[in-house]
Amino acid sequence: MAASLTLMTSPPCSRSSKSPSPSPSPSLSCNQQQQYKPLLHHQWPPQISLKKEKSNESIVAKSPVIAAATKGGSPSVQEQKWIHEGVITESLPNGMFWVKLDNCEDLVLGYISGRIRRSFIRVLPGDRVKIEVSRYDSTRGRITYRLRNNKDATTT
């Protein structure tokens, strides 16, 4: 027990100085060199790897952070919306409309999506539309498609 205490209390490195008086910066001499490992295992900035996809032969750059985030089963934006069909009852300024949903008597305040705006698709009261309603606020939605006639309305 005493031998183990002396081994535990003896320092692994011995101080060597030229004078017996303590110097401000003594040098350490060790038999074993300790290698320090970095605390972070990844490098900054992240290394970007370029690889070709076989499906469309385009080069896709993925960083390790983005690739790790997409591997998980995170829900996409489309899963957080309910898609309904309805009839526009009233037109409001700035591309907003009151939409009456088919499955219930609810009125939803809908705004025109960017694709419909970009394509200059005219939406008027009385038109049938597809609307994405948010799960978090069921009184608002995005008008994503204007149904042209009864054939489009029945083939959803």
Curated annotation (Swiss-Prot):
Entry's Gene Ontology cellular component terms: chloroplast; cytosol
Pfam families with a match to the protein in the record: eIF-1a (PF01176)
Low complexity compositional bias, start-end: 10-20
Coiled coil: none
Annotated localization: Plastid, Chloroplast
Keyword Protein biosynthesis found: yes
Renumbered residue ranges of the record's region Disordered: 1-35
Keyword Chloroplast: yes
Example of a GO MF term: ribosome binding
The organelle targeting sequence, given as a residue range: 1-49
Keyword vocabulary terms for this entry: Chloroplast, Initiation factor, Plastid, Protein biosynthesis, Transit peptide
CDD domains: S1_IF1
Spans through the membrane: none
InterPro entries from the UniProt entry: NA-bd_OB-fold, RNA-binding_domain_S1_IF1, TIF_IF1
Biological role: One of the essential components for the initiation of protein synthesis. Stabilizes the binding of IF-2 and IF-3 on the 30S subunit to which N-formylmethionyl-tRNA(fMet) subsequently binds. Helps modulate mRNA selection, yielding the 30S pre-initiation complex (PIC). Upon addition of the 50S ribosomal subunit IF-1, IF-2 and IF-3 are released leaving the mature 70S translation initiation complex.
Description of how the protein assembles with itself and partners: Component of the 30S ribosomal translation pre-initiation complex which assembles on the 30S ribosome in the order IF-2 and IF-3, IF-1 and N-formylmethionyl-tRNA(fMet); mRNA recruitment can occur at any time during PIC assembly.
Protein name: Translation initiation factor IF-1, chloroplastic
Originating organism: Mesembryanthemum crystallinum
